[in-house]
Design a protein with these regions (language model features):
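Peripheral terminal and linker regions in Fe-S/redox and tRNA-modifying enzymes
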Residues: 1-180
Length: 181
């Protein structure tokens, strides 16, 4: 059935031409990166001095294609808050962080988290400290508590069930299990 559908649409007006692809791609230019050395030894030193920072780096920071930069995922899964939920003040704060740390770019993921895609490794500690002060440094990316949850009956008029209480119960149970080990 997929192949039949493809034959119907492959040359239709909705197919993007190479010219249109080039035109739209021109709006997505990479930032002007600095030529930075990879700063792994300094980062490792900072991690060895601060267990909470180290845990956050391990869970929320990923390698970047450019030396000296990192990709940072901001978890919107703090215990006690509906998964993926953020206040207007938090979004304003994160937008300011994006301006200061990530070329003004902030991404929203399908996992209900936020990403600062171009953070200098040398600024990770300062970024973490700001996130921590605003309750946005939850180190749980990829863990059970990084729950993707439909807002369900709590926020959606189309829903026929509430899913947030279930997600919060899983989070509480997992948090208790983690704290006992």
């Amino acid at each position: 059935q997929v192949e039949a559908e493809w034959l119907l649409i492959k040359d239709s007006p909705s197919t993007i031409t190479l010219e249109e692809l080039k035109r739209t791609s021109s709006y997505f230019t990479p930032p002007t990166y600095e030529d930075l050395p990879s700063d792994e030894s300094t980062l490792q030193s900072l991690r060895s001095q601060n267990k909470a920072f180290s845990n956050w780096v391990q869970r929320n920071v990923r390698p970047h294609k450019m030396n000296g930069y990192a990709i940072v995922t901001l978890s919107l899964k703090k215990t006690g808050v509906p998964p993926g939920d953020a206040t207007a003040d938090q979004i304003d704060f994160v937008a300011d962080l994006a301006d200061r740390y990530s070329f003004g770019e902030l991404r929203v993921t399908h996992e209900q988290n936020l990403v600062l895609a171009d953070v200098k490794q040398s600024e990770l500690l300062a970024l973490w400290e700001e996130l921590k002060a605003h309750g946005l440094a939850t180190p749980n990316i990829g863990l059970l508590t990084d729950i993707i949850c439909c807002p369900g009956g709590d926020f959606c008029s189309l829903a026929n069930a509430k899913s947030i209480p279930i997600a919060q119960a899983i989070d509480r149970k997992s948090t208790r299990l983690n704290s006992s080990h």
